Regions:
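Cytosolic nucleotide-utilizing catalytic cores of signal-transduction proteins
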Residues: 1-234
Length: 234
């Protein structure tokens, strides 16, 4: 508690944490100072705000007697626009100081998913909320598990070999398909490729792996392998 108070001296009943991963940002000045200065431009906002350096980015700590979603969104959106190349994740709202470590991890995990979505889907959203990362809640804490990684590589090896030998795009198609939650129409719209082209590649993946993306149990295996691959290679 004492450490948390040193980092965040103003602590109200509710709080949320945002993680700004600026690994690929072209901004070279001191991030926390810039972020703090930008937040001062918000004319009226009841939230207490603290900024703390984190790796190549920073954490934004927001606290208030009652956090309103629109106020939280204003703060996060402002800094997302200030650091446009950042991957940004926002934790859930927490109430106990003892849960600060959990909130930090939620923000980090959400930022990592935001990074994946920006890279594979050209996701235009300013940030990713932890509440929306779905299965990644389970995968991220386990991603260093060797058996999980071996499962992914074992399933995807035939696809990787085919792409290497034929300069193919099977893996790229599979990863995009999974990121679109198995929605072929959405993948076509995002990638600019005809559905028949994508369907041909997915059928080729089925022939190589023995897993038919049209069958739910098979799709779930492909999706797990693809998501693990994305996290390991992001």
């Amino acid at each position: 508690k004492a450490r948390i108070h040193r980092i965040f001296p103003i602590f109200y009943d509710q709080y949320a944490i945002a993680c700004f991963d600026t690994e690929y940002s072209t901004v070279t000045e001191d991030y926390p100072s810039q972020a703090s200065a930008a937040l001062k431009n918000i004319p009226s906002n009841s939230l207490a705000k603290s900024v703390l350096r984190y790796d190549k980015g920073f954490f934004l700590f927001l606290s208030g007697a009652s956090i309103k979603e629109n106020e939280l969104n204003v703060c996060v959106a402002l800094l997302s626009e200030r650091f446009p190349e950042s991957s940004v994740g926002v934790s859930g709202i927490h109430f106990r100081m003892e849960d600060a470590d959990k909130a930090l991890h939620e923000a980090i995990y959400a930022a990592r998913v935001h990074k994946l979505n920006r890279k594979t889907l050209n996701d235009p959203s300013l940030y990713q909320a932890y509440s929306g990362i779905e299965i990644y809640r389970v995968l991220l804490p386990l991603i260093d598990n060797e058996e999980l990684q071996q499962y992914s590589l074992g399933l995807l090896d035939p696809v990787l070999e085919f792409d290497a030998e034929n300069r193919g795009s099977l893996l790229e198609t599979l990863l995009g398909f999974v990121q679109c939650s198995g929605n072929l129409h959405e993948l076509s719209a995002r990638s600019g490729q005809h559905e028949n082209t994508l369907r041909y590649r997915l059928d080729k993946i089925a022939a190589l792996t023995g897993l038919n993306y049209r069958k739910m149990s098979d799709y779930e295996q492909l999706a797990l392998a693809a998501r693990v691959y994305l996290l390991v290679n992001d």
